[in-house]
Amino acid sequence: MPITLPATLPAFDVLTHEGVMVMTPERAARQDIRPLRIGLLNLMPKKIQTENQFARLIGATPLQIDFQLIRMTEHQTKNTAAEHMEAFYRPFQEVKHEKFDGLIITGAPIEHLDFADVTYWDELCEVMDWTQTNVQSTFGVCWGGMAMIYHFHRVQKHRLQAKAFGCFRHRNVAPTSPYLRGFSDDFVIPVSRWTEMRQAEIDAAPGLRTLLASDEAGPCLVEDPGHRALYIFNHFEYDSDTLKQEYDRDVANGKPINVPANYYPDDDPSKPPLNRWRSHAHLLYGNWINEIYQSTPYDPQQIGR
């Protein structure tokens, strides 16, 4: 089954070209089926790139997905055209009376700030509380996951002395988890962050279960059944060249930056990077969508009750 996207959204042509099944809302309305309603609260500066990354993973599942783009109500983005935001995004205050089968809260390049110093923190707290009554399952990604685990459990993020940057080996520490169905025991995940979560502090928080972890990069994926949520601190959704773009940007700006670890062949930035995480990215998000499908009520109004 396809993902439903407006025909004018850039992701529509991108995913169609890649062979992902995409359909317009008009065509979807003629099908006698209830699609899963998945929201993307997009906090990243490069909105279109992030839309494409998550739509690609969500759209690869065998279920029809109604993909809704959501923004913070008052925050004004500086890196995406206002026309794009107006055409495709809805402010949270407009959707907060609606029900969603799933919600993804993305990362944001604001790790250096205390949570309370983020300009939209109060509304984001409202969003996170709202998920408990209006969303069947929520997926917090990188800073979004750190914000959620702090909001619900007061587990703090910690500043790193050097940026965790590259593709790091991770272990499957919960092979019986339905979210890890089909996962290998050992695999790589892109990492790009200045902060970390600490395993001992996660272990001390009641109700949390670590599913993926790395000796080098620390805890990665945490399940929070009590809040119907997953928190991932790394970036399965990244394109093959996302780390390259970040590295090239910092080099061009004269910022100190290490070559991303285990990313380029022979750690040589002149060589094209290899994508070694794509299959596990599709597994994780496909398993998440399947778990939503198995658990969400047929009547959306029953979500959260």
UniProtKB/Swiss-Prot annotation:
Name listed for the protein in its UniProt record: Homoserine O-acetyltransferase
Site location (Important for substrate specificity): 192
Listed EC numbers: 2.3.1.31
Stored PANTHER family: HOMOSERINE O-SUCCINYLTRANSFERASE (PTHR20919:SF0)
Signal peptide as annotated in the record: none
Acyltransferase is among the record's keywords: yes
UniProt KW keywords: Acyltransferase, Amino-acid biosynthesis, Cytoplasm, Methionine biosynthesis, Transferase
